[in-house]
Amino acid sequence: MTETTPKTAPWTVQKRTAVLVLADGTVIEGKGLGATGAVEAEVVFNTALTGYEEILTDPSYAGQIVTFTFPHIGNVGANAEDIEDLTPANRHGAVGAIFKADITAPSNFRAAKDLDSWLKHRGIIALAGIDTRALTALIRERGAQNAVIAHDPNGNFDLDALKARAANWCGLENLDLAKDVTIGQSLVWKELPWTLQDGYGEQDAPQYHVVALDFGVKRNILRLLTGLGAKVTVLPATATAEDVLAHNPDGVFLSNGPGDPAATGEYAVPTIGKLVETGIPLFGICLGHQMLALALGGRTEKMHQGHHGANHPVKDYTTGKVEIVSMNHGFAVDSDSLPENVEETHVSLFDGTNCGLRVVGKPVFSVQHHPEASPGPQDSHYLFRRFINLIRERKGQAPLPEREQAA
């Protein structure tokens, strides 16, 4: 009987070419992928099983390193269709990624390149071959971590310098990143939702006009609005209420985005407060939800570890139904701080944090989660129809069914 030598697991690292250095001095070694260099950021974990390209290009992840809890990332490669940031040339999104297993060759008919090459093109530093379950447990116990991720193919690292960078990084609190990821000038969005038969079509006969304030908007949000008949004009985060009203919109959308919502107080929050008073239908998502709460007199707070994934249960108090939704936020609205004329409409069934609000007597509402998914379940797509119905009501038109009827 011949003894066989145990095979080395494919994710076992032979030589360190990347490190993650936490602010407390902890050093985690692994294999480097993607771009080279070093960058400070906050380390979070995401529990989604699919959609890594959409996750990494979501501008809400600016200033963050995403740890994927699912072990096999990159199996379906990458393409130009699944990105979410509005201006790909500016590469807004996560600055780092952490994987359990090494990236394998892609196997998917839509793959245009392998994930490693795509990460390099996007400027994303990646670390593979580590115990992501242990890192996730650390984040759950200690909270989201300030850190430096570094990649050098030769494995040369000045750990003392990296530890100092991690310890001295300011973190996301009081950090305004919306100005960094917003568009430079206005644009009209016409792309429709993707279908297998036609890919992305182009809108030709809009029925309504929605102005979207871009604090880091995702493409699929804009597609769902155009898919419901809205012409969408996208304005920069710094647009004033007068800028918005000059477009004579039927509705206003407040987008998702990165950073601390309170840090936008000098420009976006006052603008939102003025727009609420106009009576124009208004819908906010994620950062837009948080800034709306601030404009209404509420408060926001930094969360321990945040919510990042595509499997979060949320209850809609307006219907009594429970939805499974996508989430990506590290700040939350303090529901106890909301004034009497603001109702809490949605709540997380994981930890009871606020996930939605509406203003009594006004066509104004928002949610913390991501109803557009991309990636994730489509349980909350009805919220876009709810927004369009507020526009239709103001025009004297009959409402659309909030949920598509089964054939």
Curated annotation (Swiss-Prot):
Query: Which EC number applies?
Result: 6.3.5.5
Q: Which domain of life is it from?
A: Bacteria
Pfam families from the UniProt entry: CPSase_sm_chain (PF00988), GATase (PF00117)
Q: Which reaction does it catalyse?
A: hydrogencarbonate + L-glutamine + 2 ATP + H2O = carbamoyl phosphate + L-glutamate + 2 ADP + phosphate + 2 H(+)
Q: Signal sequence: where?
A: none
What Gene3D superfamilies does the record tag this protein with?
A: 3.40.50.880, Carbamoyl-phosphate synthase small subunit, N-terminal domain
Q: Name one GO biological process term.
A: L-arginine biosynthetic process
Q: Any keyword Zinc-finger?
A: no
InterPro entries, per the entry: Anth_synth/Amidotransfase, CarbamoylP_synth_ssu, CarbamoylP_synth_ssu_N, CarbP_synth_ssu_N_sf, Class_I_gatase-like, CPSase_GATase1, GATASE
**Which GO terms of the molecular function aspect are on file?**
ATP binding; carbamoyl-phosphate synthase (glutamine-hydrolyzing) activity; glutaminase activity
Q: Which residues bind L-glutamine?
A: 60, 257, 259, 287, 290, 328, 330-331
Keyword set, alphabetical order: Amino-acid biosynthesis, Arginine biosynthesis, ATP-binding, Glutamine amidotransferase, Ligase, Nucleotide-binding, Pyrimidine biosynthesis
Q: Which residues cross the membrane?
A: none
Domain named Glutamine amidotransferase type-1 is located at 209-397
Pathway(s) where this gene product acts? Amino-acid biosynthesis; L-arginine biosynthesis; carbamoyl phosphate from bicarbonate: step 1/1; Pyrimidine metabolism; UMP biosynthesis via de novo pathway; (S)-dihydroorotate from bicarbonate: step 1/3
Tell me the segments the record calls region CPSase. Answer: 1-205
The active site consists of 286 (nucleophile), 370, 372
Oligomeric form and interacting partners: Composed of two chains; the small (or glutamine) chain promotes the hydrolysis of glutamine to ammonia, which is used by the large (or ammonia) chain to synthesize carbamoyl phosphate. Tetramer of heterodimers (alpha,beta)4.
Give the family, as the similarity comment puts it.
Answer: Belongs to the CarA family.
What does the UniProt record say this protein does? Small subunit of the glutamine-dependent carbamoyl phosphate synthetase (CPSase). CPSase catalyzes the formation of carbamoyl phosphate from the ammonia moiety of glutamine, carbonate, and phosphate donated by ATP, constituting the first step of 2 biosynthetic pathways, one leading to arginine and/or urea and the other to pyrimidine nucleotides. The small subunit (glutamine amidotransferase) binds and cleaves glutamine to supply the large subunit with the substrate ammonia.
Query: What is the name attached to this protein's record?
Result: Carbamoyl phosphate synthase small chain
State the organism named in the record.
Brucella abortus (strain 2308)
